[in-house]
């Protein structure tokens, strides 16, 4: 569709070509924020940008089929062997941007909110929130660390806004990178470090032999600003 629009611009409407760029990402707030900054910098009078928050396997498909320019996901000790194999089989390449220690997202009045560190055992009484992965509901494609640990209460969602509502209304939690700007939900959502020994290696996937465009390089610059060691 995007290619058809570009051809129409060139040969039918005789207008200047649109600036184009696309990203498929796991459900991270910071990837969306970085995309906003990219559009502010490079969005001219005419552009066609694409931002898709989706499941892990769909990200790989989008990059492989060139639906988007690059994909954002994480590797960990838990999923790395299988994920690297799948990435290689799809003729893709993963490059790390930065690493982050896992945190638990909770609402500010949650019974665990005052703890300096939370363990998986502490979380057992509360509903766990996981993003839906469609037909690829496997620990290796999960967006949440430790999703292989059985729990009594679990809610699967496909919308980041729903996750926030369930945190606020049900004392539910999710496990992610801890990168969550406060202005997105006031002071209502907080992140608490998880005691478990694991690291999220957040990075991007490209097709083999694909060179980053200037927009791609600029987007990665924006993403790096959210690295946990940045002030």
What positions do the PLM features span?
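Short helix-loop hinge/linker segments at domain boundaries
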Residues: 1-24, 39-44, 89-93, 114
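Central regulatory/effector-binding core of bacterial HTH transcription factors
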Residues: 16-82
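Secondary-structure junction motif
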Residues: 31-34, 80, 119-120, 124-148
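Short amphipathic alpha-helical coupling segments at ligand-binding clamshell hinges
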Residues: 34, 211-223
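Hydrophobic hinge/microswitch elements
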Residues: 64-67, 133-190
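Flexible hinge/capping segments at coil-to-helix
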Residues: 86-128
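Beta-alpha-beta core module
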Residues: 89-95, 100, 161-211
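Short helix-loop capping/hinge motifs at secondary-structure junctions, enriched
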Residues: 109-118, 196-198, 209-216
